Every structure is written in C-alpha cells, then in structure tokens.
A protein has these predicted regions:
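Compositionally biased, intrinsically disordered low-complexity segments enriched
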Residues: 19-20, 76
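Short, solvent-exposed beta-strand-terminating loops
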Residues: 70-82, 128-139
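Soluble non-cytosolic domains of exported or imported proteins
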Residues: 46-54, 66, 97, 101-105
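Short, well-ordered coil/turn segments that N-cap beta-strands
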Residues: 24-28, 67-69, 115-121
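Aromatic-lined substrate-binding rim segments of carbohydrate-active enzymes
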Residues: 59, 76-126
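Extracellular mucin-like PTS domains
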Residues: 2-18
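Catalytic domains of carbohydrate-active enzymes, especially glycoside hydrolases
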Residues: 54-80
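Active-site-adjacent "subsite" loops/lids of carbohydrate-active enzymes
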Residues: 22-54, 123, 128-167
Length: 167
C-alpha cells in the first residue's frame, strides 16, 4: 500500500487547482448594454440582421483587442427582451418600439459572433425594472406583463411605482 502525507496531498491539490485555473483563464469581460443597442440603432437607419452582425462583430473585435475574453450582453433591459419570448415583448432598444419584432434574432447573432471570435458570452437580465423616468403604462407594449397587471385591480400591486419609474 502507498501512503500519502498531508503535505504531499495539499501540494497535489494546490497544483491541480492551479492547473484548472490556468486552463480556464482569467475572467476579462465587458458589458454590452441597452445603451449599445441605442448606438446600433443610431448608426444604422436600416436595421437588418447583416447590419447588426457587422455592428456587434466590431464591438467584439474591439473587446478582443483590449484583451477581453467574455462579453456580457443585456438581454432583458426593461421588462422586455432582445430575443423572441412568449413572456416578454421585443425591446424597443433593438427595434425602436417596444413590442416590434426587429425581423431577426439578435441574441442568436451575438452568440454566433462571440463564439466565432473565441469569446464567451453571458446574458444579463434586469428582472424587476420596467421603466425609468416614466410611469405611463400606455407607453408599454400591449403584451408587456406590467401593463397587463396594471389593467386588473387584483394584480395592480405586482408593479410598483417608485421615484418616477416602474418595477
């Protein structure tokens, strides 16, 4: 039988942990937020899958040139979605108006572009924020859950108004 001392065991464990950390690499991320979707919409008057792919590819390549290895994309900014969802309307930040289909799948494109550039991608979700600076439910898409809840007295409390915003 072979015996291992506590010192040898600790050394082996530490070496294994260091090797695992080195193989995973450092976490160097940047955030692609709803402001970046606004920048895309400002740059391209014709909003197509090809234009979005071009825009996001430029963003990813810039991040890569700065040593980043991961992009965190905001996919649920204001009670809406940057992907097709049966629960949340399309985000105004991708299409210009909440509830309007942009005609392509932005999240699919972002995943493809990130992976094509050897970059990891993570989704960022704001689960509670519905609006900032407005409590006007009529500005929300008709299929926005907050608007639906507000329409019924029994569920109105599901959405809170605080500081001129909805949550």
């Amino acid at each position: 039988t072979e015996t291992t001392t506590a010192s040898e065991s600790t050394t082996e464990t530490t070496t294994t942990q260091q090797e695992e950390t080195q193989s995973v690499g450092e976490y160097k991320a940047f955030w692609f937020s709803f402001y970046d979707y606004d920048s895309y919409r400002a740059k391209y008057k014709k909003r197509t899958a090809a234009n979005f792919r071009t825009y996001f590819t430029g963003v990813v390549k810039k991040g890569k040139s700065l040593g980043m290895n991961r992009v965190i994309v905001q996919v649920r900014p204001f009670g809406d979605a940057i992907y097709k969802s049966k629960y949340f309307p399309w985000s105004k930040y991708i299409s210009g108006k909440q509830g309007r289909n942009p005609g392509f799948d932005p999240l699919k494109i972002m995943v493809e572009v990130a992976h094509d550039n050897d970059m990891k991608i993570e989704a960022w979700v704001n689960p509670y924020r519905v609006t900032t600076g407005s409590t006007n439910y009529k500005k929300l898409a008709k299929n926005n859950q907050a608007r639906k809840w507000h329409a019924k007295k029994s569920t109105r409390r599901n959405v809170l108004s605080y500081g001129g915003s909805l949550y």
